[in-house]
Amino acid sequence: MKQVDLLYTGKAKSVYRTDDPEVYIMKFRDDITAFDGEKKDTLEGKGRYNAEVSTFIFRYLEEHGIRTHYLASIESGVIAVRNLTMIPLEVIVRNVAAGSIVRNYPFREGEPLDPPLIVIDYKSDAHHDPMLNDELIYALGLATPEELDQIKAMALAINELLSDYLDLRGITLVDFKMEFGRYNGEIVVGDEISMDSMRLWDKETGTSLDKDVYRFGKGDVMETYAGVAKRILSPPWGEPA
């Protein structure tokens, strides 16, 4: 497999075509942004940590019967992925009220959400990622009712798997964002699941363990990302390595 040309550059990743039309190369860059790109920096090693965590989570999901676009790790910060037809939806599962849902609705910061809330936004920079309901999704032709039902079921299954996994490592999965695509008639998890797309709190202290550290200047971003990666990639506390 040989890298051919650049297909897409996002805020923190670049995607390349290869000589195999079914396979893309995804490179996690060291760029970090917040507030729709108004705040941006480059932090050496950040891309590697996100790639390691995403790779681990994708493999974990595959082991539990959830299809993802992940194929293989190529080198540090670089993975091979399936060529999906992406669905322009950002699917957010919220277990605890935090962030925009507290700013926009009468929830209290830290309020448990049981059952978890699924919020779906239209992935569109031009329209500033507005929230969608099912009817808007159908009217815009973004997904069929059957596809949306499957996406929601997968999102809740992933949430349960990751919440339990992280809980054993002393981390609360507050909320997280996923993207999905179509591959050979199947709905498949795409993009990434990392500290950039999850909101994580330390169970004991409530300390932020995600990109909020960068957004709001809460501490050393790289120290935080390195620590979270170590906890996610290690056995649960009390178990031998």
From Swiss-Prot:
GO molecular function list: ATP binding; phosphoribosylaminoimidazolesuccinocarboxamide synthase activity
Record flagged with keyword Lipid biosynthesis: no
PROSITE patterns, per database record: SAICAR_SYNTHETASE_1
Keywords for the protein's UniProt record, in alphabetical order: ATP-binding, Ligase, Nucleotide-binding, Purine biosynthesis
Keyword Hydrolase on entry: no
Family: Belongs to the SAICAR synthetase family.
Designated name of the protein: Phosphoribosylaminoimidazole-succinocarboxamide synthase
Organism taxonomic ancestry: Archaea, Methanobacteriati, Methanobacteriota, Stenosarchaea group, Methanomicrobia
Gene of this entry: purC
